[in-house]
């Protein structure tokens, strides 16, 4: 019959191994999560989400109501729609997208699409302006100019000596025979 000493040793060894594995896993997680680029990306995503909600609010609450005052629009952009296929009770007409959809009509909601395009343009123009201001004040280039490779016609950095796609020299060495 086995004594308790052998199983106690095994239990202690297994417990020690498990503790070491937990410590290694925790250290690996800390190494991953505390790296500079992971924290920068996480912070950037959080700021980008907040920035996007501000621009979306600006577009939908300030810009689009002003655009809706134009004589040929005369309604909020998100309420603009076209009927592609009428529903069974169309004789009264549809005042809203919800009425048309409830009646079974096929609706093209182009106003919502136009609103999303204006949101995209607002976000991209604002980000471009912020990048330009950052470059002016920090003297660092974050928007890098690109040119097309003379040989493969792919976009590469204007400062590249060789194309990353086809490995050709950009200073004309390929042309000399």
From Swiss-Prot:
Primary location recorded for the protein, binned into one broad class: membrane
Keywords for this protein: Glycoprotein, Membrane, Transmembrane, Transmembrane helix
InterPro entries, A to Z: MSC/AndL (IPR037673), MscL_channel (IPR036019)
Keyword Transmembrane helix recorded: yes
Compartments in which it is found: Membrane
Glycosylation sites per record: 165
UniProt-recorded Gene Ontology molecular function terms: mechanosensitive monoatomic ion channel activity
Keyword Cytoplasm: no
Topology versus the membrane: Multi-pass membrane protein
A Gene Ontology BP annotation from the UniProt entry: terpenoid biosynthetic process
Transmembrane intervals: 54-74, 117-137
Pathway as given in its UniProt record: Secondary metabolite biosynthesis; terpenoid biosynthesis
Protein's job: Part of the gene cluster that mediates the biosynthesis of anditomin, a fungal meroterpenoid. The first step of the pathway is the synthesis of 3,5-dimethylorsellinic acid (DMOA) by the polyketide synthase andM. DMOA is then converted to the phthalide compound 5,7-dihydroxy-4,6-dimethylphthalide (DHDMP) by the cytochrome P450 monooxygenase andK, which is further prenylated by the prenyltransferase andD to yield farnesyl-DHDMP. Further epoxidation by the FAD-dependent monooxygenase andE leads to epoxyfarnesyl-DHDMP.
Full protein name: Anditomin synthesis protein L
Source organism of the structure: Emericella variicolor
